[in-house]
Regions:
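RNA pseudouridine synthases
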Residues: 1-183
């Protein structure tokens, strides 16, 4: 920002980091651009793709769409679960994925969110019997990694002013890469 002579301007965080998830960060240099980008996120006009290391499961297909509702797990204010559509907290959730690489005990999947529900990826993959490595809230084991093995590696959106298509990519973080190389 110093190089662009923006050092005295306020920078606005558009995309916040989720706890225990590595991801691309999105910032706006102006308040107006921030509000436009925030609305784009709310209306699912930002494409987000994630890499996840999940426990290998027979229920995983080479590629698939997961379209089941998610709601609060009964008796919890934190946990979510796949619920019936009639459940009072049910919200439609849509995730698509493709297997990138399968190891003996875990699988690397490339995931696209079509909706943005709380814990959506974690709940959908736990529902398939393939919880994320390190995700002890939803059944993943922490013996190989100390956090949930989830990384937002791709963001795509139209610039809020120029409407130019912006695509951002980030490689796998060191801890996830090491697991793949040492399996």
């Amino acid at each position: 920002l110093k190089a662009q002579d923006y050092e005295n301007q306020k920078v606005h965080v558009v995309k916040k980091l989720d706890k225990d998830t590595t991801e691309l960060m999105l910032f706006a240099k102006h308040g107006y651009a921030h509000s436009l980008l925030d609305k784009m996120l709310q209306k699912n006009r930002v494409t987000k793709r994630y890499f996840a290391l999940v426990h290998t499961s027979d229920q995983l297909k080479q590629s698939a769409e997961i379209q089941v509702p998610i709601g609060r797990k009964d008796g919890s204010i934190i946990e979510r679960a796949v619920v019936d559509a009639e459940h009072p907290t049910a919200k439609f959730a849509h995730t698509s994925y493709e297997i990138v690489k399968t190891q003996a005990h875990f699988t690397l999947v490339d995931i696209q969110l079509h909706t943005g529900r709380t814990h959506q990826i974690r709940v959908h993959f736990a529902h398939l019997g393939a919880p994320l490595l390190g995700d002890d809230l939803y059944g993943g084991k922490r013996e190989k990694i100390s956090r949930q093995a989830l990384h937002c590696h791709f963001l795509s959106f139209k610039h809020p002013i120029t409407e130019q298509e912006i695509m951002l990519e980030s490689p796998l973080p060191q801890d996830m890469q090491a697991l793949l190389e040492n399996a």
